[in-house]
């Protein structure tokens, strides 16, 4: 018994097993008919699970769905998290229906982001718990407190650093390639040794390769294979033999080459061996020695280690000279082929307008050629009959054989008052000594006058040939019809006088039509609303007309429609037209009863096929007179068919008139009206046949008992009440609208009333205004479309759009107000008033977005809740602790009820969730050298700001290679005016070229540096969707005990449905269900994805941008150019000579700030591959066939297990490629992809130098100079100097310094005093730096920065030092040349310190001494002996003489 009690106690003390995790807090419950499946998920801060607990009541079985959360990072609320798109904290939120979805958060706690350039570490600092993420080439994330460091190890890092609410993207590069360092860091070597090895890797590789080659040659020397090297050594041995025999002094004892430090040998150079030196000397002196044996020496060299060592060094140097380092190689990129997109939508609109454009062009073409032909004809006529044309202005006088101007001409018999005076201005003297003869020049001025007049008329015709004047005639008949009390036949649509008809009227909106009619005094201003309300389509306009129950209103609207479609009834003059389509189709689709029996009758053939219409009027009496006798039903049907066709042909007032005649049984008036229509449109055969048929039917006896269709009663006008029934009132108006006003800038309204007025023209009810204020002096305003809202602060006040009274009531115009005062108006209760309800406001909500917005004229902090409503909230960071994650208080402590703001009031929002701002590196250009010195000496190594000296900011990191170029321009006695230089520069970022500008005589004038600061092509991409791996599945399911599965399973947007029948069986059914092989399990599901990849689509075409800079010693300037537009300024003329075209992919993916390209699904495309599950605007979409199973429980509902919902092929995204040359710039919803490693073409540059008077330059110039320098040694920025030079003359001065100066020669002028120099110093200077300008030494003050940064920050689109270094130095030997010798000598420098000079002198002295002893002395002795021989020979010759 005791054992049993112990067991019971132990069992009671044991915890109840729970799946996924123990404990946890319930965050949401949702009783529902549908159950959720058990899901257990983990996010960055917690674990969450859902489960279903079934309960039964009187109405059935229900599921109490529960969500439970357990915190893993308990203090994450201390960082004050807030929701933001693209945040780096993934949190699973629970919806109201217990569906799970992933949201992203960031911390609101402040965080300082910096980069320690000396240790290459990202430094993050905060005061509380915070979360960081580094994405890009390095990916790291985590929680931290206080300060943390993240080490960078990629050669070039392209990063997006996010910490707290801040995000910064930047580009950073080391001063050396880091692949070697990363490799050695994985070994046992300490970090300092690894860095030293990698810094000296070039010399290490050279020595290692040399040793390997030497070992190989040493091994080969032991075999006969070594003789393969004889072709190499034979030429060397042969040359050495020549030098040996002819240039070296011989030893007196043995006859071999002089050897002061060794004994005489036993072997001769020819290979002979002698025991004594005397025999050797005899052999050499007697001429028996054949000389130096080159072949023997070559064989010895093949076996010797000395030549092998020298050969190994030479081979290693040659190999490394032509081998590119792996780190500086640019791998080839695969180019993706894209198919052409479909034509844009606007092409369809263009295609629809081609016909009208074609007709316009044809007309224009015809008129133009007509004018040309007329001009040619007039020209021919003028040439043939020009005397008749010219006779208009001048006459020929036969008496004096001259031409006289007709203006002011008077006749005196056969003579005139202008005789002896010709039109050419020449006179004939009285003596007759100067005889005048008429010539061509006499009438030239009149021909020119004719030509001028003709051209003026011709040009005037050309200018007005395309002009058109739209004139709308005044509606006199319409005005008359408005004055009639009832409808008349001549006041129906077909008979209205519309005046001139212009086709352009069809394009006018009804607003303009109303303005035209109001201007013609045809309508009142109170009629404008009913006209502007006409639908734009004809069918809608006709329905709108027939909905009006008053003749004057209907007539007004129909007149407006016919003013727009002024050819509507003129189309009836013929047998076709857009306005006849409806009634003709109606006739074709309906059959007359008589035509079924007599299909060959002329009338029936006319109606059906359009045949025999001309004879259809006479075959009624002859062939159909007996058909309708005693057949009233058929009579009624056929006549109603004809009348209905007439109704479809003539809608509006015509149909109303016909309905009136039918209701009055005025058959004669009806026939008279149809005959007037037939008379107006005699050319319409089918219309004429129908009207004749109606007239014929009227003559038959069945007309007395004819019953027309009921729809005609709907077309009858209703009695015109004094006030509309829906606006009726029980008493006279208490409002005095004669005193009404309409004030502006009113946002509140008291005693709101609806107002109705009668139009004095059409009698239409004008109900477009409301009244506010007191009855004695009401204020009237335009009626709001959305009603009015009761104010949340004062319940007697009403507002527009929402309860905050932010919108002004729209005042009516003065013309409208005057019409209201003159019209009959009354007030009624305004029905569209929205009173404040208790459920309209809220204290907290699940936040969708937050930020600061312009609300009307104010700047408010606003929260957008998950229900898409906007609320004022001054906190945006205060959690509602009574709710789950994501619920924020709208007021401090959730104490105040807040009401929604209308979205119309909200504009210019800085959303913090949907549009996060990403900062970039700040570049500060400092003009003053002292300010620059102060900025860089304050040790701002962790700042993300770059400081540039303005005058040298456009210089490259490395001194460029100079080339000589001749100055061009206009040569003068002083020099060259308008001087310029022309050159070509490759459009590649980081390219720099130095120009040594020479005069035409070859004199060096000055140095200029051209630098391509940036060269890239880019496109802007917009986000389509997010995707990622499936982390769980949302499921809702239900079951039926009996019966089939539902045909349509209810599900949410984006969810897939599943079902399985015959699920009920013994032991697998809920309590109370007794079924076997029956029932159904069904439900819906949706994947829960972890958003890891964002997909973007290209929105803009590629934009090529190149920034080219020119830097002189006293100025610098840049220009941005593109391949399309050349740049022409006072300083630059730049254009692309050749252009290379590239394209960026249409769809890209971004993961961890890294671009990926490849096969990616577009939005709405769910094919197999990357991106077939898409999250768009918070909803997840996809395709697939869900796979599910279920577990049976006795007398309980089944446990559904969904194993797969969507087809998610996210693993295919892992095979996407990451192009090395692409860079990414993120910016609030869009990204810009930049490719900066392509040569975009060749730039042709013309630099304008102005006037260079180099011939007046002085050779000797007095300069007063001072300077200031600052910078660092062996760093990225180097040394920057500012020289202040004062001189009275112009001169070209060379620049000399112990450091490498970028500009070797500058131009000094009296007008310019500030000059800037950039230089690279390998030795640390003292407190001053000596710079020689011309012959003047300048002791410039030097301020050095002690920091030695190993990493360089740069903007995204600019090149770094390491890339310029790789472009300049592409081989291993280049690296050895630049760094290797210095590295070898560095240990000795550290050892001897300041005595290094003495050490170097000692070493050089020893080397020189050895060269003198072993090289120079033998040569000198040989020369001395040769000279002595010549002296001895001379003496012997003198003795003989």
Curated annotation (Swiss-Prot):
Keywords of the record: Glycoprotein, Host endoplasmic reticulum, Host Golgi apparatus, Host membrane, Host-virus interaction, Membrane, Signal, Transmembrane, Transmembrane helix, Viral attachment to host cell, Virion, Virus entry into host cell
Tell whether Thylakoid is among the UniProt keywords: no
Keyword Lipoprotein (UniProt): no
GO BP of this protein: symbiont entry into host cell; symbiont-mediated perturbation of host process; virion attachment to host cell
**One Gene Ontology CC term in the entry:** virion membrane
Q: Name one Pfam family in it.
A: Bunya_G2
Its name, as the record gives it, is: Envelopment polyprotein
Say which species the protein is native to: Bunyavirus La Crosse (isolate Human/United States/L78/1978)
